[in-house]
Amino acid sequence: MDLLQILQILFLIGRIIVGGYFLMAGFNHFKNVKMMAGYAASKGTPSAEAAIIGTGILLVLGGASFLLGYHPTIGTILLVIFLLGVSMKIHNFWTVADPQARMNEQAHFGKNIAMIGFLLMTLMINRPWPYSLGSVATRP
């Protein structure tokens, strides 16, 4: 096994971790719609239940895209849309008066912005990704 093959396998492992993270977050949205909608409503989100279902769809589709390497540009866009929206509306730490709650929201905001940076960097990775549905679809 050469270095390129090792790096391709490590990239696959990273895709499984990242894609799995977003998939689980999406499934969590569907599993806990009422609870999450209550929190979103407390943050002023209109139609909170529909917003939770919609963001769950973004997470599942984006996570699956990453995991499978199938149309990863579209998956990246979906995840960036989710992260931008939730960061500005839900984790808007600058509006929180309580210092402990503010720190918690700031941590989530920072994590989300870092994930956006990572996702944007993946747009430079050559396609099709190794060991992906995209690579299977392009084989002769």
Positions of PLM-derived features:
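Extended, low-polarity transmembrane helix blocks
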Residues: 1-31, 42, 46-61, 67-140
